[in-house]
Amino acid sequence: YLFMMQAQGILIRDNMRTIGAQVYEQVVRSAYAKRNSSVNDSDYPLDLNHSETFLQTTTFLPEDFTYFANHTCPERLPSMKGPIDINMSEIAMDDIHEIFSKDPAIKLGGHWKPSDCMPRWKVAILIPFRNRHEHLPVLLRHLIPMLQRQRLRFAFYVVEQVGTQPFNRAMLFNVGFQEAMKDLDWDCLIFHDVDHIPESDRNYYGCGQMPRHFATKLDKYMYLLPYTEFFGGVSGLTVEQFRKINGFPNAFWGWGGEDDDLWNRVQNAGYSVSRPEGDTGKYKSIPHHHRGEVQFLGRYALLRKSKERQGLDGLNNLNYFANITYDALYKNITVNLTPELAQVTEY
């Protein structure tokens, strides 16, 4: 049966090359959905806390495949080759500006959209930031070309914390979400640490029916998932999903714990987490050792009460005052965060 499916796929590919990726995708998705259904008596496995190996429904399109400007961009484009040539050497932001100034399609704030097909997702890339000026240009050097090859509409939001309070990564993500939604009706949010560099452009930065964990294999963890509930580094949710879970918690001052709380929120809302298959989720991390940032010692007490806090601490109790500036490649959102800006009522 599997051999027949493969043969049928080859025949479909040869006969459908000129009619556009959307039709081709629908045919192949239908064929694979039937295969999945015959195994599980459903279109999807019951447990979605897994890699996408079982759910993978299409191969990457061949080089000579034709798709049209009025069709939705495919998810698996010929331009997505897999391994990326990673260059971790420092580079000045001025040099990054010069490199991408040659592309007139990149608008102020780093907005870009494809011209040869209709983007499947409008993606806001949110980057929490403090004192990482040497890391940001390295990230942009890799992410911009990758997202262009994936034919996503995207923009970058650098959410920078100033002041004397410990770094609050989760609250910065909430601020970034609120500000990004003022610009465009984004439908996919990528929460991206500035020191995480993807190693494969087949790690598609779109969203799906379930929240997505992209950074599953980090070099600093020997390319192993530290634990099943690990949700750190790079994750993605649709706007609907993010609002349903009430965003990130605001109460995590210092590093550690906020990603575990996000995992709990996702599970409490009835979602599961999907992950890329195999080596697609590999990332290199820029060493930094949390320079000057304190570890949040109260994280375990908060995590024990994740469910009780979820409806009280997040997007619905967030207050802030932002200073907005624009770079050629990103929008900078500067905030001075304090605990008083996100007080939690007793639970």
PLM region spans:
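Hydrophobic transmembrane alpha-helices of multi-pass solute transporters/permeases
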Residues: 3, 8, 121-135, 139
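Conserved catalytic core of nucleotide-sugar-dependent glycosyltransferases
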Residues: 164, 168-170, 177-179, 188-192, ...
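A conserved acidic beta->alpha catalytic loop
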Residues: 119, 131-135, 160-166, 194-197
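Acidic, Ser/Thr-rich intrinsically disordered and amphipathic helical segments
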Residues: 72, 95, 124, 135-138, ...
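Hydrophobic targeting segments
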Residues: 121-127, 143, 155-158, 176
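Short, acidic, metal-binding catalytic loop of nucleotide-sugar glycosyltransferases
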Residues: 114-120, 132, 139-153
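A short, compositionally biased domain-edge/stem linker segment
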Residues: 103-115
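C-terminal catalytic/acceptor-binding lobe
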Residues: 1-73, 77-96, 251-254, 260-347
